[in-house]
Amino acid sequence: MERIKELRDLMSQSRTREILTKTTVDHMAIIKKYTSGRQEKNPALRMKWMMAMKYPITADKRIMEMIPERNEQGQTLWSKTNDAGSDRVMVSPLAVTWWNRNGPTTSTVHYPKVYKPYFEKVERLKHGTFGPVHFRNQVKIRRRVDINPGHADLSAKEAQDVIMEVVFPNEVGARILTSESQLTITKEKKEELQNCKIAPLMVAYMLERELVRKTRFLPVAGGTSSVYIEVLHLTQGTCWEQMYTPGGEVRNDDVDQSLIIAARNIVRRATVSADPLASLLEMCHSTQIGGIRMVDILRQNPTEEQAVDICKAAMGLRISSSFSFGGFTFKRTSGSSVKREEEVLTGNLQTLKIRVHEGYEEFTMVGRRATAILRKATRRLIQLIVSGRDEQSIAEAIIVAMVFSQEDCMIKAVRGDLNFVNRANQRLNPMHQLLRHFQKDAKVLFQNWGIEPIDNVMGMIGILPDMTPSTEMSLRGVRVSKMGVDEYSSTERVQPHRSRVGCSSLL
């Protein structure tokens, strides 16, 4: 009552009212920001002023029996005063030091089992070899990569059920462990973690790391398997790269590799059977990789590869709308087209029946050593922005894009007959015939393409028909970017401040 009276008196003074209403804290938004919710809004500041206090930590009362009131230097470790608002004790940071030095020790047998991913990482790094360092312009492409080596391939839901069963077996809630891998992992982990004294929540977090694939969309210049991604910060910078050989394999990378090989074999065998779809599905169901059914792996594994995508599509799973041509993965990022058969005449007067894509489209092209953005209309290349490791890689990308554009001047640049065959001695389709022809020799293609004067745009340069760089002229519609061009992620929202494409600001 006394306090309320005092506050009333204060409020009756005009100065008090002025201070409270005219200062910036009167903004309701600011008050709300710092007082609503339990989330700490300024952790660094909070930590600073807490640590300036003598007893910034609260602990259970049992601490008084376990820790002496003073340490060897006579400094007070805990205060007899209770924490306001709870029946806990106020404790000094010195108590933590005392506990770490003199507190009880426990068996460490479970640590390597729970923190297995970390122990394995240390081993991989110990046995890996680093060096030498090369200084050169790094062409990085943002790709979806696997960031935790050594994981199983369970879905988030499957992993959640396994974790609940292992860590909190007595909790209520229906858990259905159906897949072979779920049952095996649960049995194995229950045995490993018997009498484990590590906090259950920590065990749950670590299990999640071991069981679920985690992916991120990161700029990468070299290897994309998870054992390379875990050392990305050591192997590539903006203008340098360090050679690295991992000190061990991990099963998820092996599975990804095996999946690609298995899918390719299955697709190859299915194409020659009487009923390709039925035969492909039958093979997918009867194949196992590392003891796990291939169909289960296909459901979880995000590997993007042509044969893997064919198997996924056959099973009715969603696949990304990318396709391969000339060693590049094309992803349409905007526009649309319809296909129409058209007969065209080559420079050798040979008739080719090609499927023309009518309409405006934009693509990203991603290859091993070069990447590009391609904008095209019906049988016309509008713009190609390419970046690559070297002249050869850039030339490869330009040839593929020129053929893909289906321009008339490309078809007229053909000299001689097109009669390329595949390994089974079957004639290749016309688009691949054209591609093979120009991959052998692109001189006429580049000469016939035409050149244009270019504007001076930062980070961009022209390229002449003999593949030498130029700041004045360039092949029509073609520019070379010094920065990488990112692989497009359809699943990730593009933040406005970090453009997916290194040169979008220039277009």
UniProtKB/Swiss-Prot annotation:
GO terms for cellular component: host cell cytosol; host cell mitochondrion. It is found in: Host mitochondrion; Host cytoplasm, Host cytosol. Its main location: host cell. InterPro entries: Flu_PB2_2nd (IPR049110), Flu_PB2_CAP-bd (IPR048298), Flu_PB2_middle (IPR049111), Flu_PB2_N (IPR049106), PB2_helical (IPR049113). Keywords: Host cytoplasm, Host mitochondrion. It holds the Pfam family Flu_PB2_3rd. May participate in the inhibition of type I interferon induction through inhibition of the host mitochondrial antiviral signaling protein MAVS. The knockout of PB2-S1 has no detectable effects on laboratory infected mice. This is PB2-S1.
